[in-house]
C-alpha cells in the first residue's frame, strides 16, 4: 500500500513540476512580485527556509530581502511585511482587502473551515460572529462586572503560594497556578464557573485537551503537507489525531458546560436581566437562529485558545523578566507601595494610576510578544502592496515582533527597559496608535481581547510583586528564557521554577 502511495506521489510530483514551470512562466511575465529567495519547482523555497518560520528567522530574511519579501512555500505564496508603513497598509489602509484569514489543513479541522470568528474569512459571517461575541466578552461593562473576580483569583494565588513551603525555599513552577487563575478568570465570564484547585479532575482534563490542541496546531511538523498538497497523504495520521482531539474537546465543552447553561436557561427569565454570563448571550443568539450549535462550540474554542493561553504566556514572560531584572522588580514594588500604601492590594482601577506598572506590561508585550506574527492575513483577490503585486489568496504575515524590536526604530531593543515607555516612547500605547508597536494588531481583525488582557496582566503581576520578592531558584543567577515559537505563538521553552519570598508588612 505504501509503495502504491509513493508511486502516485512521485507521478504527481512530475506533473506538478511541469505545471509549476508553465504557471511560473505565464505569471512571472506580467506580475511584479516582492523580492525573495529563488524558488525551485513544486517545493518553492521550502527546502531553503524549512518549516520553522518563526519571527526571528523571518527578521533575518527581512535584513536580506527588505521590508516586504515573498516566500513560495510549495503552492502557497507567503508575503512577509516588516515595516510600520507596510503594516499600516495591510492592517488599516487596505484592511478590507487584506482582511481575510488563510486556511491550513490543521486549522480547518479545529475551526470547522472557518466557522469561528478568529480564523474565518472577512465578510458577513465574521461581522455576525464579532458582533455576537463583543457584547458578552469585550466591553467596559464586562470589565466592571468581572474585575472583582479577577482580583479575587489573584488574591487566591497569593494565598496558595504563601501556604506552599516550597515556594520560599527551593521554589515552585508558578505557571501551573497561574494557568488555574486564567481559566477561572475566563470561565467565570464564559460559564459562571471556576475550578477549586489545580488538581480538579475536570480542570486537568480540560487543560490536557487544550494543551494537546495547541501542540498540534502550533507545531511546524505539518507544514510540508499543507504547503505541498501532493504530500498530504503522509499527514493522514497527524490529521486523524487532530480530529480525535477536536471531538473530545467539543464533547467536554458540551457535556460539562453548555448543557448545564441550557438547563439553567430553561428555569430563569430569558430577557437580558436573566442572563448571567457570556454563554447565555451566545445561546440566546443560537435560539434566535443567528448562529448554529457548531458556531457556539467554535466560540468556546476561540476563547479557550485566543484569550486564555495568550494572556497566560504574557503573565509568565512578565514575571520571568522581573525575576531576571531585580532592579525593575524593586522599582515596580516601590511604586506600588508609594501609590497604594504597603500591603494595600492593587485593584483594577488602580492599574491606571501606576505608570511604571503600565510600562512593565508594555515592555513585556514588546520584547516577548505572545503572537509575534499576529494571526495571518489573506487577500481574497489580486492586490497591490507597496509597489508590488500580491497574488490572490496569499498568506500575509506582519512581523509585529520585528517592528517592535528593530534597532532602526527602537533604542537598544534587546534590553528589557520599561523606562522607554516613560521617556522616549511615552506616547506609544498597546492599542496600535504607533505601527512600530502592535501587540494586539490593528484595525478590523485586531484582537478584541485587549480590553481584558491589560487589566488582568496589571492585577496579576501587581499582586505578585506587592506580596513577594521573586527570585531565581538556588544556584541560578537568572531564569532560562529560551523562546519556544510556534505557528503564531511565543512562549518560554521551559516553565520556570521561581522562589517567592513573602513580604512582611
From Swiss-Prot:
Its cofactor is heme. SUPFAM superfamilies: Cytochrome P450. InterPro entries: Cyt_P450, Cyt_P450_CS, Cyt_P450_E_grp-I, Cyt_P450_sf. The chain crosses the membrane at residues 3-23. It is found in: Membrane. Mostly expressed in stems, and, to a lower extent, in bulbs, roots, leaves and flowers. PANTHER family: TRANS-CINNAMATE 4-MONOOXYGENASE. This is Trans-cinnamate 4-monooxygenase. The gene is C4H.
